From Swiss-Prot:
Origin superkingdom: Bacteria
GO molecular function list: protein-L-isoaspartate (D-aspartate) O-methyltransferase activity
GO CC terms in record: cytoplasm
Transmembrane residue ranges: none
NCBIfam families: pimt (TIGR00080), PRK00312.1 (NF001453)
One Pfam family of this chain: PCMT
Active-site residues per Swiss-Prot or TrEMBL entry: 86
Biological processes per GO annotation: methylation; protein modification process; protein repair
UniProt keyword terms in alphabetical order: Cytoplasm, Methyltransferase, S-adenosyl-L-methionine, Transferase
EC annotation from Swiss-Prot or TrEMBL: 2.1.1.77
Name by which UniProt lists this protein: Protein-L-isoaspartate O-methyltransferase 1
SUPFAM superfamilies, A to Z: S-adenosyl-L-methionine-dependent methyltransferases
Similarity-based family: Belongs to the methyltransferase superfamily. L-isoaspartyl/D-aspartyl protein methyltransferase family.
């Protein structure tokens, strides 16, 4: 977090003020954010479908109102209950790693504010998303419904165990750090499918991992980049 952002963030925290922006101003900030994400991606830029999704999804609708003017900064932001909305660069990277197709069925573990689910829903056919923190999950479900994401199915529950009755999934995205790849999720991943999951100890450096299930059922893993996520809660 740079000092200008920290200073402005602190001022909002102190005064509790909200500075409204117009739709055109938010649009301009969103386009700028996407350009910055592409530039920061280096040799691994997001593809056209991910770029289009992030250009469309209004991130300011997925953060607390008093943080809406910061929604298009390339930073994670608090969303309550000790959780955060991920940095846009990481959202783009994780989504790109899934290599989604328009007919795919995706499982997301950790709905949070619903932003990542909305990005996925702009690309895939159906998104199933699970949140263990009930108030957060209920807020996200209402938000996604109000924004017209009818292809997103939400549930309150322990994401470690996945969504067995909706399995198998073409892709699985875990938005909290686990100590290991959850076996129930691996079981629910289709042969030929991809899972993206951060692995590592809570609040320490973790690594974003790409897990690929081969057509014969064997599994390969690839370490992508160091990251820092809130810990996965629940059964694991």
């Amino acid at each position: 977090m740079n000092w200008q952002f920290a200073t402005a963030f602190g001022a909002l925290m102190y005064f509790g003020c909200v500075i409204p922006l117009s739709a055109a101003e938010y649009e301009a900030l969103r386009q700028k954010m996407v350009r910055e994400v592409i530039a920061a991606s280096g040799n691994s830029p997001p593809g056209a479908s991910v770029v289009a999704a992030m250009e469309k999804v209004e991130r300011h609708r997925f953060v607390p109102a008093w943080l809406s003017i910061f929604a298009y900064r390339n930073h994670p932001l608090p969303i309550g209950h000790g959780q955060t909305i991920s940095q846009p660069l990481i959202v783009a990277r994780m989504t790109e790693l899934l290599k989604l197709k328009k007919d795919d069925k995706v499982l997301e573990i950790g709905t949070g504010s619903g932003y990542q689910a909305a990005v996925l829903a702009e690309i895939a056919k159906t998104v199933y998303t699970i949140e263990i923190i009930e108030p957060l999950g209920n807020e996200a479900a209402g938000r996604l419904q109000s924004l017209g994401y009818d292809n997103v199915k939400t549930r309150i529950g322990d994401g470690y165990y996945g969504w067995p009755e909706a399995a198998p999934f073409d892709a699985i995205l875990v938005t909290a750090a686990a100590s290991h790849v959850p076996p129930p999720l691996l079981k629910q991943l289709k042969p030929g499918g991809r899972m993206v999951v951060p692995l590592g100890a809570p609040f320490m450096t973790q690594y974003l991992m790409l897990v690929e299930k081969q057509p014969d059922g064997s599994v390969t893993t690839h370490q992508i980049v160091p990251v820092r996520f809130v810990p996965l809660r629940g059964g694991h």
